[in-house]
Amino acid sequence: MVINDFTNTNFVILAHLYNEKNNENVIKTTQDEVADKLQLSRVTINKAFSLFVQNGYLQRDLKHVGRYYLTDLGCTVVENIRTLSVEVNMLSQKSLIK
């Protein structure tokens, strides 16, 4: 994993996909729907999806056009970044209290 893969925008997109996945990690939301929901351009979403597929965070569903699976790696990345964010916020609050 390359940290540059996770600019704020890319992480927002991947986290949104994480929230949209079903219990089999299937994402039925289209790129257009993601763009509308996140108020981002279709080009931005398409570039992010391509990056995520290239790096193993998403996998295309070969049976259904436009459908993707969030891989175990993609899930782990979102969970780890969320955990790290909580820990950093807690440390920041502790340093403000001192």
Q: Which residues fall in each region the model found?
A:
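Minor-groove-contacting beta-hairpin "wing" of winged helix-turn-helix DNA-binding domains
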Residues: H64-D72
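Short, locally clustered residues in the helix-turn-helix/winged-helix DNA-binding domain
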Residues: A15-N22, R82
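Short amphipathic alpha-helical interaction segments
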Residues: N8, Q39-Q54
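Amphipathic alpha-helical dimerization/coiled-coil segments
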Residues: R82-K98
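Short, charged/polar, Gly/Pro-enriched secondary-structure boundary elements
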Residues: G74-N80
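A short, conserved structural fragment
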Residues: V53-K63
